[in-house]
Design a protein with these regions (language model features):
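Short secondary-structure junctions
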Residues: 1-5
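Conserved C-terminal structural/oligomerization subdomain of aldehyde/semialdehyde dehydrogenase
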Residues: 7, 14-116
Length: 116
């Protein structure tokens, strides 16, 4: 753990941004759905390896890929088993859009005219 990892003192239930380095695929953080500002950093050699690692979970709410190559982004979108995949940005929820998780990340969807 490089940053964060301890609850903030005081009123409320706040958790600081947390950065985890040297994360391995067999660690729970790679398989559980974490709602919080926690970023596990994992090394990979190929896009296929990264997709396999990302999909190695029962959950699939949202994913992001950062790349300068449009072909790489499109391959990632097709290969990731997530309800939403963002390119070169973090999770952003536009209320006009329909949002849905995949696998154990929820049933149905929310927002937009189809989510009402």
């Amino acid at each position: 753990m490089v940053l964060g990892g301890k609850a903030v003192a005081g009123k409320g239930y706040y958790y600081p941004p947390t950065l985890l380095l040297d994360v391995r695929q067999d660690m729970a953080i790679m398989h559980e759905e974490t709602f919080g500002p926690v970023l596990p950093v994992v090394s990979f050699d190929t896009l296929e390896q990264a997709l396999t690692m990302a999909n190695d979970s029962d959950y699939g709410l949202t994913s992001s890929i950062y790349t300068q190559n449009l072909n790489t982004a499109m391959k990632a979108i097709k290969g990731l088993k997530f309800g939403e995949t963002y390119i070169n940005r973090e999770n952003f929820e536009a209320m006009q859009g329909f949002h849905a998780g995949w696998r154990k990340s929820g049933i149905g969807g929310a927002d937009g005219k189809h989510g009402l």
